[in-house]
From Swiss-Prot:
Cofactor(s) recorded in Swiss-Prot or TrEMBL: a divalent metal cation
Organism encoding this protein: Drosophila sechellia
Pfam families: PTE (PF02126)
Disulfide bridges in this chain: none
Family matches, as PROSITE patterns: PHOSPHOTRIESTERASE_1, PHOSPHOTRIESTERASE_2
Cofactor annotation comment: Binds 2 divalent metal cations per subunit.
Recorded family membership: Belongs to the metallo-dependent hydrolases superfamily. Phosphotriesterase family.
Gene3D superfamilies found in the cross-reference section: Metal-dependent hydrolases
Positions bound to a divalent metal cation 1: H22, H24, E169, D298
EC number(s) recorded for this UniProt protein: 3.1.-.-
Alphabetically ordered keywords of this record: Hydrolase, Metal-binding
Binding site for a divalent metal cation 2: E169, H201, H230
Name of the protein this chain belongs to: Phosphotriesterase-related protein
Gene Ontology terms: biological process: catabolic process
Amino acid sequence: MSTVQTVLGTITPNLLGRTLTHEHVALDFEHFYRPPPPDFESELKAKISMSTLGYVRLYPYSSKENVRFYDGEALEAAKKDVLLYKKHGGGSIVENSSYGLKRNLEFIVELAKSTGVHFIAGTGHYIHAMQDASHGSLTVEQMSDLYSKDIITGLQVNGKVVKCGFIGEVASVYPIHDFEKNAIKAAGEIQEVLGCGVSMHPHRVTKAPFEIMRLYLEAGGRADKCVMSHLDRTIFDIDELLEFAKLGCYIQYDLFGTECSFYQLNTSVDMISDGQRIDNLIKLIKEGLVDKLLMSHDIHTKHRLTSYGGHGYHHIHTNILPRMFDRGVTLEQVEQITVTNPANWLAFDP
């Protein structure tokens, strides 16, 4: 029987409830730090407060405090928001921190125990530039062995075995680095063997998701068990997105809550708003793709947590779903996207 492998053990898919499929509760994002504009250097070097928050929202990757999403203050704030998520009807969170992001399994397990939210942890590799010496030269075979071990055997966390429940996020730049190609191929190989879900992180160019899927499918991975993340900042043209959808993977809009004057990690494009995300999802629903859609926030900086003036993990449930209902999306369609699709993606027979 297919089950979902959480950090506290296996559960039946129907117990997941509403699920956020791409989140982080602790990670190191300092690699993406950008020097602040000279005019705002002092504000962005200062501690995040009401007087500096406006600058941080405009330049989130120019505040070193903001990208240190792993210190004690960040963990305390994340726990508070997971509890709020639970209070507002959240059931499960898929934690996408992989090798290179300094995944904190100990904290994820503690959150699962203390909040009652199901957590599914990922294995896999982030971009090559963020790997240490012990991982940066791994072969496809070595990666495959590692991913299989993390899922089947598990890892020791405070004397207990904790097993990962999917492969992800597997991240790449563009053109895709050879190391990252190996990680994508390894994910495809192990997916074929185990049947588990996979989550991909494409670079911020339209060609990237297509190239990732080609490598993954050629390695043997199933399209219907693969999620392509961050498509709300990658493929902006609906016709092109529909063409990509023909490959059969899940289409994930996972930057809900990110609304900004410009996208600091790719200033050549404009980040779409939550309203535009909703409109695009409705277009995809009308094209018959409701069974291929997923939603999340990809929280990875402090300023998106409520303790720092942000929206928290409950934003989709409390703010986005009501707007979707107002625009004609049915409860059945919302349940498909937030409950059924995540369960179908995560369930496998280890």
